[in-house]
Swiss-Prot record:
Cysteines engaged in disulfide bonds, as pairs: 82-135, 165-249, 191-244, 196-207
Assembly and oligomerization: Homotrimer; disulfide-linked. 2 Ca(2+) ions bound at each subunit interface in the trimer hold the trimer together. Interacts with the intermediate capsid protein VP6. Interacts with the outer capsid protein VP5*.
Residue positions the entry lists as glycosylated: 69, 238
Record-level Gene Ontology MF annotations: metal ion binding
Other remarks in the entry: Some rotavirus strains are neuraminidase-sensitive and require sialic acid to attach to the cell surface. Some rotavirus strains are integrin-dependent. Some rotavirus strains depend on ganglioside for their entry into the host cell. Hsp70 also seems to be involved in the entry of some strains. In group A rotaviruses, VP7 defines the G serotype.
HAMAP family: Rota_VP7, Rota_VP7_A
Official protein name in the record: Outer capsid glycoprotein VP7
Binding site for Ca(2+) 2: 177, 228-229, 231, 301
Pfam families: VP7 (PF00434)
Alphabetic keyword roster: Calcium, Capsid protein, Disulfide bond, Glycoprotein, Host endoplasmic reticulum, Host-virus interaction, Metal-binding, Outer capsid protein, Signal, T=13 icosahedral capsid protein, Virion
Region annotation GPR motif: where it falls in the sequence: 253-255
Signal peptide interval: 1-50
């Protein structure tokens, strides 16, 4: 009996000793692996040059949230700048080498000559149909015209903000806008927009759903239309679809790599959607000069201050992708 108990105790002690030995062996092996891994990291770290993403960046909200950039003063060496101007500027200057002249002047401000791109547009109406902004920073010059003030404001609203858009089938469905950020954006050679608000029984309010002549006309033969109606109410729409495309869009936030520079005019463009708030003028500037050379000289002189108010995080704008995100 005592022999069996002694054997059991001895077996238990041997098991404990073996287990302790195994654990110590595993610990030494793991320490060896970890130390070798750390040694490899220390040796290779001077040869690795990878950016550190996401440590202090917000993971919610707009990706356009401005973040501190420790290399901001060197941004011009690795960035592109697009300059959009009306063709009348080139006509007035009448100099085939004026692009090269401005590129050399930009060089004095720290911008390499190969990073500046000049793009002309005929007029506000034509630019509204097919705006394309591809550079890291985009400066859009608009000469003030009192007869086109509203068109300029709509174009500025389109350019200075990001929009998430989806197609609208106005022949089959009614549509409503859910909040102030929800707008209907139309583009085309000629956009005429008519709307008929509906009650809860889908009957027209002040109009007949079967007679488009009774609809309220909110835009007539325009190139770009941003339509805002009463939120929460269904609407039946009538659009010149053969010459115009309409999309249901949601304003996501600012497109911070775009700035609009108004040339001349006594009034400052305002793209504020809500009439009860202060005017929205972020990245909207004005230059008051009569001659285009003077306008260009002024902008070159202040280009670095203008860019400091911008961010190159935003997506590019291509109206060809209008069905998804602009």
């Amino acid at each position: 009996m005592y022999g069996i108990e002694y054997t059991t105790v001895l077996t238990f002690l041997i098991s404990v000793i073996l287990l302790n030995y195994v654990l110590k062996s595993l610990t030494r092996i793991m320490d060896f692996i970890i130390y070798r891994f750390l040694l490899i990291i220390v040796i290779l770290s001077p040869f690795l040059n990878a950016p550190n993403y996401g440590i202090n960046l917000p993971i919610t909200g707009s990706m356009d949230t401005p973040c501190t950039n420790s290399t901001r003063e060197e941004v011009f060496l690795t960035s592109t700048l697009c300059w959009y101007y009306p063709t009348e500027a080139a006509t007035e200057i009448n100099d085939n080498s004026w692009h090269g002249t401005l590129s050399q002047l930009f060089l004095t401000k720290g911008w390499p000559t190969g990073s500046i791109y000049f793009k002309a547009y005929t007029n506000i109406a034509s630019f509204s149909v097919d705006p394309q902004l591809y550079c890291d920073y985009n400066l859009v010059l608009m000469k003030y015209d009192a007869t086109l003030q509203l068109d300029m404001s709509e174009l500025a609203d389109l350019l200075l903000n990001e929009w998430l858009c989806n197609p609208m089938d106005i022949t089959l469905y009614y549509y409503q806008q859910t909040d102030e950020a929800n707008k209907w954006i139309s583009m085309g050679s000629s956009c005429t927009i008519k709307v008929c608000p509906l009650n809860t029984q889908t009957l027209g309010i002040g109009c007949l759903t079967t007679d488009t002549n009774t609809f309220e006309e909110v835009a007539t033969a325009e190139k770009l239309v941003i339509t805002d109606v009463v939120d929460g109410a269904n609407h039946k729409l009538n659009v010149t679809t053969n010459t115009c495309t309409i999309r249901n869009c949601k304003k996501l936030g600012p497109r911070e790599n775009v700035a609009v520079i108004q040339v001349g005019g006594s009034d400052i463009l305002d793209i504020t959607a809500d009439p009860t708030t202060a005017p929205q003028t972020e990245r909207m500037m004005r230059v008051n000069w009569k001659k285009w050379w003077q306008v260009f000289y002024t902008i070159v002189d202040y280009v670095n201050q203008i860019v400091q108010a911008m961010s190159k995080r935003s997506r590019s704008l291509n109206s060809a992708a209008f069905t998804n995100r602009i």
